[in-house]
Amino acid sequence: MADGVFSVLLVDLDDFKEVNDTRGHAEGDRTLIWVARFLERNVRDHDIVCRTGGDEFVILLPNAGEAGSSLLIDRLRSALDAANAGRVTPIGLSIGSATWPDNGSSAERLLESADMAMYQTKQRRKAARLPAKTIPMRVRAMEDETLPWGGPTSGS
């Protein structure tokens, strides 16, 4: 790599199970094909788009650091907003990014970092769709889940 960095984006479809359950697996398959083509159309020529399984995709960005991956994420969001305008069932994507070597020195660690970032994005997107009165309870529940011992945040 020319400048010694590259980034990995982990892309997960939001609410994909609902598409399969309510519209059928054939529609789910068409949705996955649509997303794969959408991603391929909106990355640079030398970027690599892979479906890793289920409703997850990985995009490898050679010679792109954090700034480059952020630009691509913004471009994907804008293009997705435009593409969703004509869709009966809008598609949502949660995207996490990680940059080598800052976020991991091995492929496994880099993917773990991108996965954690994607999960945080997905949680923020879900929280944004909750009625306002349920958000504090949701935040508390997420805090409880992150404690290393799995116990309550206050108490005994």
Regions found by a protein language model. Give the residues of each.
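Conserved long alpha-helical elements within nucleotide-processing catalytic cores of c-di-GMP signaling
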Residues: 1-8, 14-44, 50-54, 58-62, ...
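Hydrophobic pocket-lining residues within nucleotide cofactor-binding pockets
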Residues: 13, 64, 85, 100
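Nucleotide-sugar donor-binding/catalytic module of glycosyltransferases
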Residues: 25, 46, 79, 102-103
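Catalytic cores and conserved motifs of cyclic dinucleotide signaling enzymes
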Residues: 30, 67-71, 88-89, 100-156
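Short catalytic/binding micro-motifs of nucleotide second-messenger systems
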Residues: 41-46, 77-88, 120, 124
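Catalytic core regions of nucleotide second-messenger enzymes
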Residues: 51, 80-94, 126-131
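Short aromatic/hydrophobic contact patches that present stacked aromatics
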Residues: 58, 96-97
